[in-house]
Amino acid sequence: MELPISFLSDSSRPAASSERGDQAALGRGELEFDEELVFLAAEGEGDPEEIEGPEVREQSELLCIIRQKEKDLVLAARLGKALLERNQDMSRRYEEMQREMTDKLEHLEQEKHELKRKLENREGEWEGRVSELESDVKLLQEELEKQQVNLREADREKLSVVQELSEQNQRLLEQLSRATEMERQLSQQVNVLQEEFREKSLSTSQHVSRLESLLAEIKMLSDRKRELEQQLSTIMEENEQLQGLVEELQDKELSLNQQNFGKDLQLRESQLEIEEMRLSYRQLEGKLEELREEKSLQHMNSTSTSLLSEIEQSIEAEEQEQEREQLRLQLWEAHCQVRSLCCQLRGNESADSAVSTDSSMDESSETSSAKDVPAGSLRTALSELKSLILSILETCDSASSRKCEDDGLEEQIKQTSEDSRALRELLQGEQMRMKQTFDELQELHKQVTLLSVEMNALKEERDRLLVLTQNDETQEQLMKAIKDRDEAISKKTAVELELAKCRIDLMSLNTQLLDAIQQKLNLSQQLEAWQDDMHRVIDQQLMDKHQKEWSQPAYSFSNSHHVKQCSKAAAMKHAERPGEESIGAEGRRLFSFLKKTKC
């Protein structure tokens, strides 16, 4: 009984180790088979021991052995059959898995070959770029070395120039000490000449004081001139204003004269008309008196008249009435004329309306009776005419008074013009004085120029004495020393400029080199990041494929392993960019591990 169970356990171990995917299904069959074996063993052990005796026991033991052998044979047959079926299933599944594995391996080999080709292309490109950058860096390093060599040479030249300049400075200091001694001697001579010059400058100081006094007088006169010019400008403005007033008054006077002339003409016409009216009035009064006398005579002779006389009287009465009507009409016309004259003299706007009313009244008076004419209307009109004439005469008197005022203004203008003339004369006098002072200043200027000429002559004499006192050799040495110093200073400035240019070039080259190094670092970082990304992609694909392969056999083993792999994949997916170096290292380790497992 123990041999088949051990055989089963030994045979199940390689199957479980080789094919993990079908472990659950096979485990169920093994459990059923074990249960049957246990059941058979229990049946064999549970036989009754009621038969007594040795023979019976032997027979029973033989029977038990036979039965046990039969059972073992049956079990062996069943087990062989089960094992054959299981081996067939396992071989079939193994062939299928082997096919799938070969297909997947071919696919992975193709992908691996493509990725290798891409990686080689990219590596070739980056190597070319890196080689270019390295060549650029080499060129820049060579240029930097050249610049450093040039700088060293420039420093050497600078040191040599500084040494030469220091030697020249020492020489110049010696020459300066000699020159100071010469200057002391010359200063003594200059002091002597200065004393002589002071004696001559005393006379010039007197001239200068006189010039200052004249300048003060000129300032006073110029101030006076400005004040007079201001007064003249104010007077001229007032004169212009007065001239404007005079012109306005003259215009007003002309207009008033024209009005007076027109009114004089109107007065003359009105006076002539009044005289004519008076003559007509006297004639009318004479006619009225004659008519009254005739009337009185007719009343006296009325008693003694006859029919013929009555007829004649009636005819005469009609004629008298006609004459009276004519007289009344003439009186009315005279009244209208007087009223029109009054209206013209007043200058009212209602003159036209009055004339129109008068004309209408004339027309109505011709048709109406003579009783409509007022009794004292002519006298009132004449009185109005007299009052108007008196008012016109008064206006003429006022115009004459205005003329007197205009005459006064003209006199004031004449006085202002005389004052302006006097001011102009004063200005002319001041200008003459200014000219005199200017002439005096010119004379003083001439004297000053003469003094300056004398001073120049004295300076020339002093220079001549200095030239005589100085030695020709010392002067030449001084000139040479000054020239050498100037040349050394110019050389020093040129060298400093060249050094500054070299420093600027070196700084620019350093910046270019730093930029190139920075670009190289950036490119190397990009290349590393790209390599890490490629490794990560390859690792991810390989891990996915292996997970698919491992998930097909036994589920009990693959569950825990699958969970671990999923957690690793999730951790790799959710990893951030800043940790690229650690992720790349882990990916490389996983890639090497997977390669080893694959081999």
Curated annotation (Swiss-Prot):
GO terms for biological process: Golgi to secretory granule transport; neuron projection development. Its main location: cytoplasm. GO terms for molecular function: dynactin binding; small GTPase binding. Residues 1-27, 352-375 are annotated as: Disordered. It is found in: Cytoplasm, Cytoskeleton, Microtubule organizing center, Centrosome. Keywords: Coiled coil, Cytoplasm, Cytoskeleton, Neurogenesis, Transport. GO terms for cellular component: centrosome; cytoplasm. Residues 80-341, 405-536 form a coiled coil. Acts as an adapter protein linking the dynein motor complex to various cargos and converts dynein from a non-processive to a highly processive motor in the presence of dynactin. Facilitates the interaction between dynein and dynactin and activates dynein processivity (the ability to move along a microtubule for a long distance without falling off the track). Predominantly recruits 2 dyneins, which increases both the force and speed of the microtubule motor. Component of secretory vesicle machinery in developing neurons that acts as a regulator of neurite outgrowth. This is BICD family-like cargo adapter 1. The gene is bicdl1.
